């Protein structure tokens, strides 16, 4: 909701007279909140499906937008196939039916670093080692906690519009478009766009800068010049490949 001109979560108590306007998925802020919350639901469901025996060996990566959804991979398991997709999707719907509260918790930054290490979220563990603030807000769904840069839905009950599709060794988390919030469009493969975006991801992986935390490490080690030189080499090679195709 908007408290005057400030965006606030629904759990926020109003302390005095003000003008309120409720935000929906027709608003950009509301639409982003819905998509962010569904991503949290997806990651929680993946962790529930794989169990708690080996969380540090499994890494859920939400890579990039692809049409109305996000392309995601789950690293550290034998195979991302139809059975795994079905189990995750079923678990997501179960969590929706349970209307689990999505709560915000203020914890010490050092505690957050330890938490992300236990979950195997080493990218966020690295990121928070650079955080100057002594405390951080995390969102929780039952015992599972994670960090997000924006507001969340108050509970899982309204996160019922989504679909999962197997694609290129990963999963597309498909969600409604902004102008049709109660309809999940069919996933239409975008192979050319996928190849370009995947190549960008590979470039980051090859340089060891697949996350912001990793990039911070490189900056503190004074390796920015090397990063720029390698990126320029990648670009020159790509331009050469395009020239060959034209010729």
Name the predicted role of every residue range.
Residues 12-33, 45, 53-66, 71-246:
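Auxiliary tRNA-acceptor-end handling modules of aminoacyl-tRNA synthetases
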Residues 1-10:
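Short acidic beta-strand-loop surface patches of small beta-rich interaction domains
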Residues 37:
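TRNA-recognition modules of translation machinery and tRNA-sensing kinases, especially anticodon-binding
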